[in-house]
Regions:
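Short, extreme N-terminal segment that most often corresponds to the first beta-strand
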Residues: 1-11, 168-171
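Generic structural motif
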Residues: 8-12, 41, 149
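Generic detection of long, well-ordered alpha-helical segments
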Residues: 11, 15, 140-143
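Residues in flexible loops and secondary-structure boundaries
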Residues: 13-15, 46, 152
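Short linear, low-complexity motifs centered on an aromatic residue
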Residues: 13-34, 157-170
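Mixed-charge (acidic/basic) macromolecular-recognition segments
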Residues: 18-137
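Acidic, proline/glycine-rich low-complexity IDRs
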Residues: 121-171
Length: 171
């Protein structure tokens, strides 16, 4: 009745077709993707859904799915907390479709992200940048709630806390 196509497919065959696709075509006993029809599509990110009517051409869906698969596999070329930042950006943009997710992924550098675990450090850095003498005065050092200060500064600077409360993001 059908086959699942797992993406990304990192191996390209001599004829320019991906190995995963070649296997699917052979299993379905067809020559091209155009001879197939999409029955269902799923994404490993629960916040994204792929509408069956979103793509006119199945080939475009396969390429976009493959591209997103590469993005997730590469994790922003080792960028720390890539997936947290990416998922927060998806939420920030209220993104639920594949095409917009690819756009966000390719422009992820346009977003600033601060993990919730770093809020205290963020507050401390803001104070240091402002040249506050708090850190040189032992009496004042213990009197500042750096976590509360950091949260207030993040909100003042336009950051939004994601619904999982794991990080703050802004564009």
């Amino acid at each position: 009745e059908g086959v699942w196509l797992c993406l990304p497919d990192s191996t390209i065959g001599e004829e320019g077709r991906m190995d995963e696709i070649r296997l699917a075509l052979r299993e379905l006993k067809v020559q091209t993707v155009q001879e197939c029809r999409l029955l269902d599509a799923r994404c490993s990110l629960p916040e994204l859904s792929v509408g069956l009517d979103e793509y006119q051409d199945l080939t475009d869906l396969i390429y976009d799915g493959n591209d997103l698969g590469y993005v997730l596999q590469e994790q922003g070329q080792g960028e720390p907390r890539f997936l947290e930042k990416f998922r927060s950006a998806l939420e920030y943009e209220q993104c639920h479709d594949l095409k917009l997710a690819l756009d966000i992924a390719s422009n992820l550098n346009c977003y600033d992200y601060c993990p919730a675990s770093d809020v205290e450090r963020f507050g401390e850095e803001v104070l240091q940048k402002q040249g506050e003498t708090v850190f040189r005065d032992p009496v004042l050092q213990g009197g500042i709630d750096l976590k509360a200060y950091g949260e207030a500064q993040l909100e003042q600077q336009g950051y939004l806390l994601n619904t999982a409360e794991t990080g703050y993001i802004r564009r």
